[in-house]
């Protein structure tokens, strides 16, 4: 079992500090459904950024840079593959028609 979380701030109402606080709280709350790995994906300066580690959310500090307004996150409970091998953890980078994206696997 895993969990997804995210944040959208299109009107740019939230400070970067507040966004980071919200994301870390959401990740920790989602940890009950995935304790083996935690990751986020976001767009920054026109590039997709992925930050993930084989750690439970309570041990990982999520920090996004100023100007990021959309973030998708994932906490993982390992059912296949080894969570200690970080390439097995979400989000994954994918490509379609020359565009980069972080696909949702298994939906």
Residues covered by each model-derived region:
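N-terminal glutamine amidotransferase
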Residues: 1-106
């Amino acid at each position: 079992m895993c969990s997804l979380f995210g944040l959208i701030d299109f009107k740019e109402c939230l400070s970067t500090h507040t966004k980071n606080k919200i994301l870390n709280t959401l990740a920790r709350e989602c940890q009950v459904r995935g304790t083996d790995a935690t990751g986020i994906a976001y767009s920054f300066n026109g590039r997709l950024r992925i930050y993930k580690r084989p750690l439970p959310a309570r041990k990982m500090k999520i920090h996004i840079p100023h100007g990021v307004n959309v973030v998708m996150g994932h906490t993982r409970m390992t059912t296949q593959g080894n969570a200690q091998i970080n390439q097995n953890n979400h989000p994954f980078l994918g490509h379609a028609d020359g565009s980069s994206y972080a696909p949702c696997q298994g939906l």
